[in-house]
């Protein structure tokens, strides 16, 4: 049985046959809407920062949205109380209001046009000062400073690194124009990386966060390029005979794996970044595509219909025998492994729809975590706690984030638009 054209948005067959993008107008900026109820969330009060009323960015509001979106925190209404980092709040009264932690701070303009952002974190239960931070930033980096505040608070209270100052990449289509965007993890501050009248698909961050690999159709066939995020320069990575699609970086950034059809059928190859012939890794007569490395580089997960329907397999990075991974459901695609190596996210066809699933790799336990039916392109946050994915909600294209149990979701899309192919970048170095 061959794989149908709906096999994957990352596959070339899908893009050509299914018309992956609609004609709706695209929105590059996002509105975060958090839904769901978590039972183990830490209640935290984030008071409006002193001076933020005159600031271009409302730091306290951004921090509150970040922490709630993580699924680890529940905001406690600060009641409009403004408090800075130098004033000790009445922690006993905040405890009575239900808060276990509290953030206070200030944002002040400097004479040179920059801003001074300061915060202090309080343990309300123990009535302790947990420390603070300060950031001197330009006006354009005020939102980034708010995300760094969120990172500080998250790490102090959970012991894990925060992901709020990381970035996501995604693709939009407006009319006949395709654009690759790089944005904050909440979807704001989006910057156009490149635009084209021809389709752009499959953006993939390099492990360093300096490069984005992607597939362009500007040559009337799929070709893989890398885009330098800092300079905007691009480099040709794969333009072999036939199609070149579904790029994925090795964890050390030394090579790509991709789907090539230079020998006829779609097979997986490794590609050196310094040229040379690609090395064929799969040797089947079926369609093999959508490769994804495990974080330790010891395995490559991929999709194949060699068993009669699309399923997820894994193999050594040197190729050879493949082991089937998915057995629940007759149609499973778009595998991605969490950075901690514990989880496999993928999309499964259920009753005619496509839903995001998560498998615990140590046990094989599978959980469906969405109630939408057009999910695609999952990508893990670098701390493995959240997944960003594309879907349709109430008839509109959307980017969503979800916790791994599916309880807390945040819609990152605006009122409408064609927004696809999200990929979550690594921690900033």
Swiss-Prot record:
The keyword Signal is annotated on this UniProt entry: yes
Organism superkingdom: Bacteria
Record's keyword annotation contains Cell division: yes
InterPro entries referenced in this protein's UniProt entry, alphabetically: 6-blade_b-propeller_TolB-like, PD40, Tol-Pal_TolB, TolB_N
Role description: Part of the Tol-Pal system, which plays a role in outer membrane invagination during cell division and is important for maintaining outer membrane integrity.
The protein's name in its UniProt record: Tol-Pal system protein TolB
Chief localization: periplasm
Subcellular location: Periplasm
GO BP terms in the entry: cell division; protein import
Signal sequence region: 1-28
Subunit relationships: The Tol-Pal system is composed of five core proteins: the inner membrane proteins TolA, TolQ and TolR, the periplasmic protein TolB and the outer membrane protein Pal. They form a network linking the inner and outer membranes and the peptidoglycan layer.
Record organism: Polaromonas naphthalenivorans (strain CJ2)
Keywords, ordered alphabetically: Cell cycle, Cell division, Periplasm, Signal
One cellular component (GO) term of this entry: periplasmic space
Similarity comment: family membership: Belongs to the TolB family.
């Amino acid at each position: 049985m061959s794989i149908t054209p709906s096999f994957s948005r990352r596959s070339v067959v899908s893009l050509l046959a299914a018309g992956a993008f609609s004609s709706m107008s695209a929105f590059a900026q996002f509105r975060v809407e958090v839904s769901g109820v978590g039972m183990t969330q830490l209640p935290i009060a984030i008071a409006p920062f002193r001076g933020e009323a005159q600031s271009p960015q409302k730091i306290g509001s951004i921090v509150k949205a970040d922490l709630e979106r993580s699924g680890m925190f529940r905001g406690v209404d600060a009641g409009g109380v403004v408090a800075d980092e130098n004033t000790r709040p009445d922690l006993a009264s905040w405890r009575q209001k239900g808060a276990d932690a509290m953030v206070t701070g200030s944002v002040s303009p400097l004479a040179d046009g920059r801003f001074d952002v300061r915060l202090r974190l309080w343990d309300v239960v123990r009535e302790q000062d947990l420390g603070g931070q300060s950031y001197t930033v330009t006006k354009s980096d005020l939102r980034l400073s708010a995300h760094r505040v969120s990172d500080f608070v998250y790490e102090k209270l959970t012991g894990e690194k925060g992901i709020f100052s990381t970035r996501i990449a995604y693709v939009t289509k407006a009319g006949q124009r395709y654009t690759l965007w790089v944005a904050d993890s909440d979807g704001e501050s989006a910057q156009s990386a490149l635009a084209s009248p021809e389709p752009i698909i499959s953006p993939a961050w390099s492990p360093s966060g300096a490069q984005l690999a992607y597939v362009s159709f500007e040559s009337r066939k799929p070709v893989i390029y890398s885009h330098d995020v800092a300079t905007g320069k691009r480099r040709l990575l794969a333009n072999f005979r036939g199609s070149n699609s579904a790029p994925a970086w090795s964890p050390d950034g030394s090579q790509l794996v991709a789907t090539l059809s230079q020998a006829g059928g779609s097979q997986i190859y490794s590609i050196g970044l310094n040229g040379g012939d690609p090395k064929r890794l799969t040797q089947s007569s079926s369609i093999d595509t959508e490769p994804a490395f495990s974080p330790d580089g010891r395995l490559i997960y991929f999709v194949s219909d060699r068993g009669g329907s699309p399923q997820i397999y894994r193999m050594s990075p040197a190729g050879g025998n493949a082991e089937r991974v998915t057995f629940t459901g007759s149609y499973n695609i778009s595998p991605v492994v969490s950075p901690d190596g514990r989880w496999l996210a993928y999309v499964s066809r259920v009753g005619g729809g496509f839903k995001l699933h998560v498998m615990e790799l140590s046990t094989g336990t599978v959980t469906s975590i969405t109630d939408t039916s057009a999910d695609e392109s999952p990508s893990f946050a670098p701390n493995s706690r959240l997944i960003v994915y594309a879907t349709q909600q109430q008839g509109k294209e959307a980017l969503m984030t979800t916790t791994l149990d599916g309880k807390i979701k945040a819609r990152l899309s605006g009122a409408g638009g064609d927004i696809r192919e999200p990929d979550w970048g690594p921690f900033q170095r």
